[in-house]
């Protein structure tokens, strides 16, 4: 697994409400997480965004998992990008091309799974780990392209500060400030995590034609021009609206921790089929046939990761 290193961390200030001239957007929906409890791979599982085909394009799935033993052994992917963020603990990642790495709390990894991706995600040293993973659609023209990985260490995130707010921009841009360069991926997104003291606020300026999700890890906030309340494990979704710069206002009711995702819709039909995200059910079935025929490559002979491939 290749790891990209980025330039020295930048320190800057978020725009205050008086500095920003962008139009503030209102939240479209607030969605409660669905608690699934224990699953075959996870000791505790929450669907922040259950697998949808296009409602929040380009975001297809957002899921939180906690595990300390099995985790997600060798499994395939095709036609999808993933952004995995480590909430707590350490996550071990391997792929069948020989890549290996360990992500710690606050680290992230971006993967584009084109024609063939075969990997596993495990609790490092069998100690508890909690992750949040987003699935992001790929355009049809890129679903059979090459597979790539980029590690995004917390230490390399762009640090953005203002009174009562500490944010880390992992990828994308906010108010002219940039995170890691992931321009090699086909559907660039912006992703940041932020800690807010009670009564603190900030504005996230983004193009109006992007979908935005504000997920509350802890505490309670108000978001958008209508000051919509969002509590722990709730997510406020903002529809794509128009071209031009807009602002997503986040105000902390209590001390709060939030994760913010934004991306431009792909605008193509898509079908989720187990670990595959193609444009038709037939293409998903073909991917599974190719995986079973061994076309994704051999599964390494590693006693800790040789369980049957797991479908998320």
Residues covered by each model-derived region:
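Jelly-roll (double-stranded beta-helix
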Residues: 1-312
């Amino acid at each position: 697994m290749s790891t990209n290193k980025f330039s020295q961390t930048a320190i800057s200030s978020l725009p205050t409400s008086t500095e920003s001239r962008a139009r503030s957007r209102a939240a479209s929906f607030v969605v409660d997480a669905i608690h699934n409890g224990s699953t075959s791979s996870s000791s505790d599982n929450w669907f922040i965004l259950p697998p949808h085909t296009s409602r929040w394009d380009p975001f297809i799935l957002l899921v939180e998992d906690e595990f300390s033993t099995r985790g997600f052994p060798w499994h395939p992917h095709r036609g999808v990008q993933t952004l995995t963020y480590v909430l707590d603990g350490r996550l071990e990642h391997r792929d069948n091309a020989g890549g290996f790495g360990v992500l710690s709390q606050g680290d992230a990894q971006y993967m584009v799974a084109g024609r063939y991706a075969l990997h596993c995600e495990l609790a490092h040293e069998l100690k508890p780990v909690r992750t949040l993973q987003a699935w992001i659609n790929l355009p049809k023209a890129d679903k059979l392209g090459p597979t790539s990985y980029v590690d995004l260490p917390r230490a390399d995130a762009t640090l953005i500060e203002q009174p009562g707010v500490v944010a880390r921009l992992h990828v994308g841009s906010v108010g002219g400030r940039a995170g890691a360069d992931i321009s090699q991926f086909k559907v660039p997104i912006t992703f940041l995590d932020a800690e807010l003291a009670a009564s603190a606020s900030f504005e996230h300026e983004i193009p109006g034609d992007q979908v935005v999700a504000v997920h509350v890890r802890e505490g309670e906030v108000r978001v958008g021009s209508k000051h919509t309340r969002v509590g722990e494990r709730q997510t406020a979704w903002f529809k794509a609206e128009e071209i031009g710069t807009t602002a997503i206002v986040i105000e902390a009711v209590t001390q709060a921790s939030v994760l913010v995702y934004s991306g431009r819709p792909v605008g193509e039909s898509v079908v989720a089929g187990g670990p595959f995200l193609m444009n038709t059910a037939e293409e998903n079935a073909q991917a599974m046939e190719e995986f079973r025929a061994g076309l994704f490559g051999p599964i390494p002979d590693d006693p800790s990761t040789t369980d049957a491939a797991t479908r998320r």
